[in-house]
């Protein structure tokens, strides 16, 4: 399995972890756009982060990470569903991006929004400044500054692989004394901080855990598959056209030379609607779906 998340627990301390490995879904996202290497790396890190966060949540819905700035990289966005389906996109000015560009040069004065959109229930959004040296530090800062469980991230991507590690301190169970809990938490963090980029990207999960925590009692759970999937569809595109109203849809059809084309920014899928399709959209509630003709 090339794309998966995997949970682990420390038996003697109140800490849990999550690891993510992405290859095929990451390649699928990069294949849709000719991203510069620094952008591709950041996008991979954000994909890994989104998958890590979904692994810590019990919900049915969508998690969205969206970073915005007024720099060379104006938008970085990843969605991960509770079904562990990922997609991502970036908007950038290639002429302003150097080969060694980092987060701060790409997205100066940026902000990161973390949105949890459940199928049922209230939508939640948290916002943090992109003021860390990398995305992992920004996310860790968000959890440190909010009323969340203490959480740390380690993220790496190289244009072919994206990997992530998350550690989270749980409410008291094995340990109740605050100083003991803090010492245990600091201990697992200190060991994780010794990870190199090569190790995080290259080691399989059992080997990585043994490398870090061979003196601890750690339980590693089964792998949970992750995959790329875009939620766009012809039906959604048709609904977007229908929402314009018949007069505006027909005007758009005329302006575009007899065929309205809607492109998905995430996957580059193209949905085309001709005059017959537009007429069918407004033919009444009992009409059939638009034809499957594409141009």
UniProtKB/Swiss-Prot annotation:
CDD domains found in the cross-reference section: Hsp33 (cd00498)
Processing after translation: Under oxidizing conditions two disulfide bonds are formed involving the reactive cysteines. Under reducing conditions zinc is bound to the reactive cysteines and the protein is inactive.
GO biological process: protein refolding
HAMAP family membership: HslO
Disulphide connectivity of cysteines: 230-232, 264-267
Keyword annotations from UniProtKB, A to Z: Chaperone, Cytoplasm, Disulfide bond, Redox-active center, Zinc
GO molecular function, one term: protein folding chaperone
Family: Belongs to the HSP33 family.
PANTHER family per record: 33 KDA CHAPERONIN
Purpose: Redox regulated molecular chaperone. Protects both thermally unfolding and oxidatively damaged proteins from irreversible aggregation. Plays an important role in the bacterial defense system toward oxidative stress.
GO cellular component: cytoplasm
Major localisation: cytoplasm
Localisation per UniProt entry: Cytoplasm
Name of the molecule in the record: 33 kDa chaperonin
InterPro entries per UniProt: Heat_shock_Hsp33, Heat_shock_Hsp33_C, Heat_shock_Hsp33_N, Hsp33_helix_hairpin_bin_dom_sf
